[in-house]
């Protein structure tokens, strides 16, 4: 495989890629970073937040100026002191469920917040070229990811 791949922790014989995404409340992708599949999520937080386009940063800043709180929902893999400190320094309120708490909340009838990101995973995996990585160069794969994200955004703006 090409660059930006690493040993897949679930399938030792193949290389894999990790797509770290930042989505808005409806699941529309606004930030994207690629790395090897063996890279831990905690190490991708800074680069994923830095991948926000200027328009999204302007909207975020306007929301904060109006007194709005900017929350960030993350999975249990992000539950670390380093991530919480980074998010606090950048002005985000972290919503990170510890491992096992999501099962308890499901029993209590609460809805999980991460389903929006999981839906975005599903939308991107509908593009066969992304589901099975054929591109050797990370630039080509990243370009296809950006194209798919643009198409998802366009579709949601028209029909969303």
What are these regions (language model features)?
Residues 1-93, 98-99, 148:
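Polybasic low-complexity intrinsically disordered regions
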Residues 49-51, 59-62, 99-102, 123-124, ...:
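Short, surface-exposed, polar/charged, turn-prone segments marking secondary-structure boundaries
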Residues 45, 71, 110, 123-124:
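Preference for short coil/turn "hinge" residues that link or interrupt alpha-helices
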Residues 103-109:
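Short, charged, surface-exposed secondary-structure boundary motifs
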Residues 43-44, 62, 104, 137, ...:
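Flexible domain-boundary/linker segments
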Residues 86, 90, 111-160:
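Basic, amphipathic alpha-helical segments enriched in Lys/Arg and hydrophobic/aromatic residues
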Residues 77-79, 100-103, 122, 129:
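Short Gly/Pro-enriched loop/turn and capping motifs at secondary-structure junctions
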